[in-house]
Amino acid sequence: MSGYPGQGYQGQGYGQGYGQGYPPQGGYYPPQPGYGGYPPQPPPPQHYQYGPPQGGYQYPPQDGSRAGPSDQAHQPPQGMQQFGHGAPSDYAFQYSQCTGKRKALLIGINYFGQEGELRGCINDVRNLSNFLMEFYQYRREDMVLLTDDAQDPMSQPTRDNIVRAMHWLVEGAQPNDSLFFHYSGHGGQTEDLDGDEDDGYDEVIYPVDFRANGHIVDDDMHLWMVQPLQAGVRLTAIFDSCHSGTALDLPYVYSTSGVLKEPNLAKEAGVGLLGAVQSYARGDLGGVATSLFGFAKKAFSDKQARDRTMRTKTSPADVISWSGSKDDQTSADATIASQATGAMSYAFVSALRANRNQTYNQLLNSIRDILEGQYSQKPQLSCSHPLDTENVWFVM
């Protein structure tokens, strides 16, 4: 969802220093001490202030394929795979066959009573959980739902509860297990302190009590949910929030053509050279040198940031992240078929209901096709390892 609380749906400001020192507003319950796990939760109570219709999303007709991909030619390769792409020669990863245990964590925050209140995030959790159970064999007792309409304090999406649930999600995961993480709420950016971001900003998400207890930064989400995973474990993540393109800090990013994205040095060079030409026209030789030096410094800094990410943020596990927008974009809090919803969450479910036998590139294009008629945001696919987007079918 766009911006962060209090910024407005189309705001472009960053979250640096934001959300500190404010008292929590409405609906916050302190976490219970000594909580050691997540028992099965009852369905969340219906406290929607906007009256969503019964029955959930209105989707396009589905293809009838409930069993999912079966063509062996499109199944994930088995065994350890080499990274390549400039990674150290001893780096290897393993695709998950997604035949093992399934666990899911879904978070939806409407920020009731707070500035920047949203409408569709809780609906996203309800609809995504139903979709997982209907089409991907997830069980309700293996899901944790955190929404800010919950009566149980442990089901509120506070910072402590979210962090605890992230640890629960990955604990004990084994090869070929399939884990699912979904976040629908406010997202933003804050200054990058460890040098792993090309644009100088880390991506963050905002718990319901962020004013009192702060946001959660992408470096920490990677530490808690990606680093503990062993080879062959799948984590599928969906971020329906602003500035979420690399919200899990995964180093391999793909476009709709399936090509690995690199820093756009040609574009940066154009800006740098334009400044140099303008300075030369004014007779400002010092300005020429400054413009060219500035470009060279920026290019070197971008390369350093990407090299650091490639060294520190890869994983032997099979981690895929679908994001509602690029790092510099906002995401839409939409109304579809009279129901408030996150546009990315709706598009993801709609694309898979229509056809589950899609490669990663086909699915990314399907999601963008659903969105592009009404929204400017461009969803993004990122991965913890090199991904054969053209030939391997999406599974989870």
Swiss-Prot record:
User: Compositionally biased, Gly residues: which spans?
Assistant: 1-20
**Gene Ontology biological-process entries:** apoptotic process; proteolysis
Q: What residues sit in the active site?
A: 186, 242
InterPro entries named in the record: Caspase-like_dom_sf, Metacaspase, Pept_C14_caspase
Matches recorded under Pfam families: Peptidase_C14
List the EC numbers from the record. Answer: 3.4.22.-
> What GO cellular component entries does it have?
cytoplasm
Q: Which UniProt keywords apply?
A: Apoptosis, Hydrolase, Protease, Thiol protease, Zymogen
Region span, Disordered: 1-86
Domain of life, per UniProt, equals Eukaryota
Alphabetized GO MF terms:
cysteine-type endopeptidase activity
Q: Where is the composition biased (Low complexity)?
A: 47-62
Q: What class of enzyme is it?
A: hydrolase
Spell out the Polar residues composition-biased ranges. Answer: 72-81
Q: Of which family is this protein a member? A: Belongs to the peptidase C14B family.
Q: Which PANTHER family match?
A: METACASPASE-1, METACASPASE-4
Role: Involved in cell death (apoptosis).
Protein name (record)? Metacaspase-1
